[in-house]
A protein has these predicted regions:
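N-terminal Rossmann-like FAD-binding beta1-loop-alpha1 element of flavoenzymes
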Residues: 6-31
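Short hydrophobic core segments
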Residues: 9-11, 187-199, 337
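Active-site substrate-recognition segment that forms the wall
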Residues: 22-25, 51, 76-83, 196-318, ...
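Glycine-rich FAD pyrophosphate-binding loop
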Residues: 25-44
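Dinucleotide-binding Rossmann-like beta1-alpha1 core, especially the glycine-rich loop
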Residues: 48-121, 242-243, 280
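Flavin (FAD/FMN) cofactor-binding and adjacent substrate-gating region
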Residues: 73, 87-158, 163-164, 170-176
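Conserved beta-strand-loop-beta-strand element in the redox core of flavoprotein oxidoreductases
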Residues: 169-187
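C-terminal catalytic lobe of FAD-dependent flavoproteins
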Residues: 283-387
Length: 387
């Protein structure tokens, strides 16, 4: 285990950096820096934030399942129950079969329903437009603001520091650790945790570290008047993730669930992508979307195998990767934060992660340093992340 007095710099104030810093702060001197004036500005703060266990491959499923105890199984959960409904048009019945087979034995209460039951839950899909659906009754809307507040509070109560409008300008290697340049200030630290999302490779280059194969993907979303009371609707996702709809206050939120390759930037909504979302939703349902109330976009950053990179840069004991959460950042943040903190400290894997079968090697960034070790694109994942 590393020294208790270790000075750790976490670069990035998204949900990844916050959760990791929250678990590190009781054991080290933690400073989290964020270039923007508010936390979680670029991705987390634009999130549709659903808790679901129907997510990703087995490694991602395990960190999602492990996160339930922190997010849901508590006196005051970070959200409220909203079932998740995967809906398939008649021509995609096989895709629904495949999705059911993938999660049936893993997700408690997962239920296959017929077209009439789909219509009962989501009345804007007539029975003739659906082959059926798959319902996860234990899914939840997550309160991102409450979760961010909890992580920030844990950091500060443990003596950690959160610095806003603090731009990371690079580091210089010392005999032991780094001298980090934060705006005009030099800060000596023992360990750098790179939790910079779409900017992860820019931070790495500032430390003289080779880039990882990270790809920021832009997604646009919008709200609209559903023409009636949508409050009781589930979170509805097309089985092949071509669109999604969920209640959003007095309105409904929609998206084409697109993944448009992008550069790291303050993303803005794409008019064509918004129009595509409207077209897909209106073709699949009886909704008439005559106007858009609000629209926005954000970046979701992925590795080639769609698992985050969590671990030390091979050959370094002072540069730690925590990037590539993609659409799983919010819902996996307790498990991913605890995993990253334990690995960064050289500590034993927390019991709740071990009990869930979380395997740290599944997320080791070393898998991208050996040619041919990254796996292929996994099955479609729920569009839980706005955008």
């Amino acid at each position: 285990m590393r020294a208790m007095t270790e000075r750790i710099l976490v670069v990035g104030g998204g949900i990844a950096g916050l959760s990791c810093a929250a678990f590190l702060a009781p054991h080290a001197q933690v400073t989290l820096v964020e270039a923007e004036p508010i936390l979680t500005y670029h991705t987390t703060g634009r999130s549709a934030a659903l808790y679901t266990e129907c997510f990703g491959d087995d490694a991602l499923f395990r960190v999602a399942a492990a996160s339930r105890s922190f997010l849901v199984d508590r006196a005051e959960p970070f959200g409220k129950v909203r079932p998740l409904l995967f809906v398939a048009p008649p021509e995609d019945a096989v895709a629904l079969d495949d999705l059911e087979a993938l999660y049936r034995s893993k997700v408690p209460g997962l239920e296959r329903i017929d077209a009439e039951a789909v219509n009962a839950l989501f009345p804007v899909v007539p029975p003739q437009r659906a082959a059926g659906g798959l319902v996860e009754p234990g899914a939840m809307d997550l309160d991102v603001h409450a979760l961010v507040t909890e992580y920030a509070g844990l950091i500060r109560r443990s003596g950690g520091s959160i610095r806003m409008r603090a731009r990371f300008a690079g580091v210089r290697k010392l005999d032991s650790g780094w001298e980090a340049q934060i705006d005009d200030e030099a800060l000596e630290v023992d360990l750098v945790v790179n939790a910079s999302g779409a900017w992860g490779n820019e931070v790495a280059r500032g430390a003289g570290i080779d880039a990882l194969p990270l790809e920021p993907l832009k997604r646009s979303a919008f709200t609209f008047d559903p023409g009636g009371d949508a409050h009781g609707w589930p979170f509805v996702i097309d089985v092949l993730e071509r669109w999604y709809v969920k209640p959003e206050g007095a309105f409904a939120l929609g998206s084409a669930a697109s993944e448009i390759p992008s550069i790291p930037h303050d993303a803005r909504p794409d008019e064509i992508d918004v129009a595509l979302g409207i077209e897909r939703i209106t073709n699949a349902t009886t909704l008439e979307i005559r106007s858009v109330k609000t629209q926005w976009a954000g970046l979701r950053t992925f590795t080639p195998d769609r698992r985050p990179a969590i671990g030390f840069e091979p050959g370094s004991d002072s540069f730690f990767w925590l990037v590539g959460q993609g659409g799983a950042g919010v819902l996996t943040s307790p498990a991913v934060g605890a995993l990253a903190a334990s690995l960064a400290r050289g500590a034993r894997l927390p019991e709740f992660l071990a009990d869930a079968g979380v395997e740290p090697l599944a997320f080791d960034p070393a898998r991208f340093r050996t040619p041919g070790t990254a796996t292929s694109h996994p099955p479609a994942q729920p569009a839980i992340h706005r955008p």
